[in-house]
């Protein structure tokens, strides 16, 4: 059994590989499970690839106009300059960049206005211009105009500050919105990484909702190893069973054949038991089993005919043993070759996957860097939004004080801060617009990759770089298997070469002998089975029967059973005790001055009656009284009849039959109702004789040997079917459409959850920066107006 032990070693190797998979899954889980917090991932699977685009939000988004600046030549030699070319052709990116450059120059120039020298010069020039206008328009109505001017000033304050408040509110709203989309983008990145991690984990280990059910969406390397293990386990079981059944050693007696010989001895035991108990019934109780005597004769024929087929059985078993040994040799070679060719490839893929994941982990530190940088950016944005919020509160309070008259125009200390506000919003515009351009550029490149990948996956666009690759092959052949057809075809051919047809022919040839034997037995003996419980009077050497002189009484007594009912079987009829006694009472008591009954408690209580039981005697006084009242020539006949009926009652009550030779656990004798139970109202009660006989006959039938080898052949077929099933499962669950669907899912998660949110985020950042620019301009104007004009 060297081959058997070698396969056990291979089985241990598969377990070690599975352990490596679990360790690798643990490493991936430690690194990437962080991104799956609060995620409920249930990856669905659909055979229709087109349905995977139904929920593709990216393809239907109006933001697709942002991603139209690419050309095919950009990807002929894709590098950093290609990215710059795409961005240069994007009008939105370039407009934002130009605006940023121009505004930055203007902003830094306006900072000169806050210097004391420039501020003094501008104020002198403005004051000179104002003085000339004031002298020309000076009049005697200054007092009335002062009231009107105050009203106009307050209205101007209200309108101006209301505009500022609206812009600040819009700024905060756009800021909150872009923070919302920033968080969505962050979650999208987490979700995308989580999806990739989940799919990698499902590729390694069995993560199906029902671990026992193979699902294409979660078919994994562990499934492949489990399939290999199940093939080995099934093969070990078949081979071990063959070893236990001595099928691998032609010199060892075949157990079933030994049982076959033992079975014939059991038939002799049964025959002897029937003869022994029937002899007891005849000699001690003057009754007999007519059906059992027929069965005994049939057993003699069965034993004689069965022995003739023993030689045939020996020859067919020898031939089958030789065939099974050859089949095991073929299976051993096939499985060994499969392990030799396939296991290194699988382990190589697993090892390479582990190295790649560890390399990405060590190089990029994804888990640490992504949360770190996203949190820093988010915190920075929150800090940048705090000053606009405080300015908004300050202006609202300032407006309230102006309306209430607490602050005069010459005492507007808050207005002095407008220069600082302008400087802040200008700087905020530059910072936010820079972020916006960065995110917009990233989203443009990301969106371009989404559009290209969609067209590639739909086989609408091809790149030379993908030629002769697995992805290119699978896109063109969605239903093609990833595994080479030659591997599965050659393997299936080897498995299907296991031809057991010649075994079937030989076994079926010898089966005919035993089929004829079985049919002969059931034809001869089954007709007795329903009536083996019938007991009638013994004809030969029956002392009591011979005493009866009245022929009318004696003849019907011969076929009277031991039960009350009449029984018909075959072409014979057994008279029931009730019928017989009714006729007997009419004969011996024509004047109804007496009555004989049998096991009848009610009758026993009546006058001029005698109830026969197992304890009855012809010397009983009640019987003597009835006997004395009948014709004298019938009295001796009645005595004999009563004594025979006492034996009938004893047969019904006493334990007569010894079955220890049939059942070694049964030491005590049993009664008639147990030895040969009666079938009443269609109820089938199996006697120990019936059960023993049928079981023995079935067991000696060669069909048991046939069934055994059918079972062995079925086990080989189960092994073959299992291997074919696992190959089909592997092929079906590793088709190209699975790879394409996984790529579509990764693309869809990336484009919908990351690129689209990032594009929306960049739009709101630009809106925010434009609003900040307007606030910069407004505060700069107000500062210039209030600080340069004369008091």
Swiss-Prot record:
Residues the record marks as carrying a glycan: 23, 42, 48, 137, 153, 278, 467, 477, 541, 607, 611, 681, 701, 757
Name the UniProt record assigns to this protein: Putative iron transporter
The keyword tRNA processing appears for this protein: no
GO cellular component labels: membrane
Sorted UniProt keywords: Cell membrane, Coiled coil, Glycoprotein, Membrane, Transmembrane, Transmembrane helix
Summary of the knockout phenotype: Conditional knockdown results in decreased growth rates of blood stage parasites that can be rescued by the treatment with hepcidin, a specific ferroportin inhibitor causing an increase in labile iron levels in erythrocytes.
Transmembrane segments: 93-113, 163-183, 382-402, 425-445, 764-784
Cell inner membrane found in the keyword field: no
Induction (record text): Expression is modulated by the levels of iron ions in the environment.
Coiled coil: 225-284
Superkingdom: Eukaryota
Lipid bilayer topology: Multi-pass membrane protein
Subcellular location as annotated: Cell membrane
């Amino acid at each position: 059994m060297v081959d058997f032990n070698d396969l056990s070693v291979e089985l241990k190797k598969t377990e070690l590989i599975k352990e490596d998979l679990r360790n690798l899954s643990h490493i991936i889980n430690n690194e990437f499970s962080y991104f799956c917090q609060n995620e409920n991932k249930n990856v669905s699977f659909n055979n229709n690839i087109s349905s995977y685009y139904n929920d593709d939000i990216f393809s239907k988004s109006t933001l697709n106009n942002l991603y139209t600046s690419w050309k095919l030549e950009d990807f002929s030699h894709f590098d950093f300059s290609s990215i710059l070319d795409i961005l240069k052709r994007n009008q939105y990116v370039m407009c934002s960049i130009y605006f940023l450059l121009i505004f930055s120059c203007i902003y830094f120039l306006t900072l000169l206005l806050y210097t004391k020298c420039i501020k003094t010069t501008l104020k002198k020039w403005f004051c000179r211009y104002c003085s000339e206008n004031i002298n020309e328009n000076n009049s005697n109505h200054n007092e009335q105009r002062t009231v009107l001017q105050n009203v106009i000033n307050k209205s101007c304050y209200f309108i101006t500050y209301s505009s500022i408040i609206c812009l600040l509110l819009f700024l905060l709203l756009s800021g909150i919105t872009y923070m919302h989309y920033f968080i969505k983008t962050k979650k999208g990145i987490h979700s995308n990484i989580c999806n990739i991690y989940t799919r990698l984990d499902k590729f390694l280990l069995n993560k199906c909702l029902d671990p026992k059910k193979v699902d294409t969406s979660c078919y994994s390397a562990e499934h492949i190893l489990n399939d290999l293990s199940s093939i080995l386990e099934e093969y070990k079981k078949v081979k071990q069973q063959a070893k236990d059944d001595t099928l691998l050693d032609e010199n060892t007696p075949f157990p079933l054949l030994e049982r076959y010989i033992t079975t014939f001895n059991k038939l002799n035991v049964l025959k002897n038991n029937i003869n022994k108990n029937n002899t007891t019934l005849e000699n001690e109780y003057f009754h007999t089993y007519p059906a059992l005597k027929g069965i005994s004769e049939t057993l003699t024929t069965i034993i004689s005919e069965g022995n003739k087929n023993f030689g045939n059985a020996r020859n067919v078993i020898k031939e089958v043993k030789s065939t099974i040994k050859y089949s095991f040799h073929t299976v051993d070679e096939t499985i060994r070759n499969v392990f030799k060719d396939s296991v290194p490839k699988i382990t190589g893929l697993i090892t390479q996957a582990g190295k790649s994941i560890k390399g990405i982990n060590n190089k990029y530190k994804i888990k640490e860097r992504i949360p770190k940088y996203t949190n820093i950016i988010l915190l920075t944005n929150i800090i940048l939004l705090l000053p606009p919020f405080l300015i908004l509160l300050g202006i609202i309070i300032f407006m309230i004080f102006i309306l209430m008259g607490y602050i005069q125009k010459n005492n507007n200390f808050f207005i002095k801060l407008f220069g600082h506000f302008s400087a802040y919003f200008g700087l905020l515009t530059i910072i936010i617009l820079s972020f916006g351009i960065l995110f917009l550029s990233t989203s443009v490149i990301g969106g371009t990759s989404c559009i290209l990948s969609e067209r590639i996956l739909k086989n609408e666009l091809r790149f030379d770089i993908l030629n002769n690759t697995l992805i290119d092959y699978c896109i063109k052949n969605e239903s093609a298997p990833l595994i080479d057809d030659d591997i599965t075809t050659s393997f299936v051919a080897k498995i299907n070469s296991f031809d057991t047809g010649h075994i079937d022919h030989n076994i079926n040839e010898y089966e005919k002998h035993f089929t004829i034997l079985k049919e002969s037995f059931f034809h001869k003996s089954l007709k007795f089975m329903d009536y083996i419980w019938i007991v009638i009077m013994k004809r030969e050497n029956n002392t009591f029967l011979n005493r009866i002189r009245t022929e009318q009484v004696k003849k019907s007594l011969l076929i009277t059973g031991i039960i009350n009912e009449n029984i018909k079987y075959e072409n014979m009829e057994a008279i029931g005790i009730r019928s017989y006694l009714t006729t007997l009472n009419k004969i011996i008591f024509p004047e109804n001055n007496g009555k004989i009954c049998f096991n009848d408690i009610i009758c026993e209580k009546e006058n001029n009656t005698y109830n026969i039981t197992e304890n009855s005697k012809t010397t009983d006084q009640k019987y003597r009284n009835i006997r004395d009242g009948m014709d004298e020539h019938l009295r001796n006949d009645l005595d004999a009849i009563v004594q025979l009926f006492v034996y009938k009652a004893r047969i019904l009550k006493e334990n007569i039959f010894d079955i220890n030779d049939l059942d070694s656990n049964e030491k005590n004798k049993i009664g008639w109702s147990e030895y040969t139970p009666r079938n009443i109202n269609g109820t089938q009660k199996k006697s120990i004789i019936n059960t023993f006989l049928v079981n023995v006959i079935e067991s000696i039938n060669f069909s048991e040997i046939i069934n055994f080898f059918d079972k062995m052949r079925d086990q080989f077929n189960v092994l073959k079917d299992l291997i074919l099933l696992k190959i089909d499962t592997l092929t079906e669950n590793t088709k190209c459409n699975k790879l394409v669907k996984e790529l579509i899912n990764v693309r869809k998660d990336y484009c919908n959850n990351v690129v689209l949110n990032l594009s929306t985020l960049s739009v709101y950042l630009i809106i925010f920066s434009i609003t900040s620019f307007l606030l910069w301009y407004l505060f700069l104007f107000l500062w210039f107006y209030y600080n340069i004009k004369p008091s």
